[in-house]
Design a protein with these regions (language model features):
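Short catalytic/metal-binding and nucleic-acid-binding patches
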Residues: 1-160
Length: 160
């Protein structure tokens, strides 16, 4: 995958995909996936981004986020913060992430719902769960409270 230009501001909502180095199943273990979620929630609680949906798969993750900082900075914090902690706390050595990531700005309510469905069903498509709610490394399955959908994406009938 060619590295796209990531010149973004913190004003949009984005669908993100980031892969582990050479698509290795580095996030397959409970320790690694759990640590990634800790890092994800930590930067969210620091106000770096709003988190609308997520799933951590064995070799990649998907997010629906609205960055408060730039999108580039949000991904740098997540990936870099996780790498630092995985090396320090779990003794991991070697490359963890591919350098690039995929981002798509969410334009409207229909697109938001399509990405939300994609994120929630990703573990089902990969045979890791029978439903999104059964997969604990996802917003559908771990019971965490998510940030609200930005008003600008909601149809006028839902904005009131």
């Amino acid at each position: 995958m060619a590295a796209p230009y990531h010149g973004t501001t913190g004003s949009g909502t984005y669908f993100i995909t980031a892969c582990t180095f050479q698509k290795q199943s580095l996030l397959q273990s409970d320790r690694m996936a759990g640590l990634f979620l800790e890092v994800l929630f930590n930067y969210r609680s620091q106000g770096k981004y709003l988190l609308h949906e997520f799933v951590v798969m064995p070799d990649h993750f998907h997010l629906l986020i609205t960055p408060i900082v730039t999108l580039e900075r949000a991904l740098q914090l997540m990936k870099g913060g996780f790498s630092f902690r995985a090396r320090k706390e779990l003794g991991f050595s070697g490359e963890i992430w591919e350098k690039s990531y995929y981002d798509r700005r969410v334009r409207d309510w229909e697109e938001y719902l399509a990405f939300q469905k994609y994120v929630r069903l990703n573990p089902v498509r990969r045979g890791l769960a029978k439903s999104g709610e059964e997969y604990r490394y996802s917003s559908a399955g771990c019971g965490v409270r998510l940030d609200a959908v930005p008003q600008r994406l909601k149809p006028s009938s839902l904005s009131a």
